[in-house]
Regions:
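Bacterial Sec-dependent N-terminal signal peptides
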Residues: 1-22
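Repetitive, compositionally biased segments used for assembly/scaffolding
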Residues: 23-118
Length: 118
């Protein structure tokens, strides 16, 4: 009975440990809009300032926030936000955001960063 409880606990906790290694990279433009991208998953986020309008592409992805254009790769990942380019490794993890380089360990966790986004 004791082993079943421990096994159940491990099954519930281990997925959260694995997903907890993602790093959020955040920067602002000159007007105060905040943009972010997650290093491992590549998820893109943003905030707006008063008066901003959002434009969408035909596939419902965001194409413009205020005066900032968002560009995508053919696979749907974000390639450019304003003047900040985003590069990816072959496994889909983010390798570079602007001038910020991201290094990973062999098991896919973020090891270090160097540089800065803008």
């Amino acid at each position: 009975m004791y082993r079943k409880k421990i096994l159940t606990l491990l099954i519930l906790v281990l997925p959260f440990i694995g997903f907890g290694q993602d790093m959020k990279i955040t920067w602002e433009d000159n007007y105060g809009r905040e943009f972010s991208i997650r290093a491992i998953s590549g998820n893109f986020g943003y905030s707006m300032i008063p008066g901003d309008r959002i434009s969408y592409n035909y596939d419902d992805t965001v194409s413009k926030i205020g005066n900032v254009y968002i560009r995508y790769n053919y696979d749907g990942t974000v390639s450019k936000i304003g003047d900040v380019y985003i590069r990816y490794n072959y496994d889909g993890t983010v390798s570079k955001v602007g001038g910020l380089r991201i290094s990973y360990t062999y098991d896919g966790k973020v090891r270090s960063t160097s540089g800065r986004v803008r």
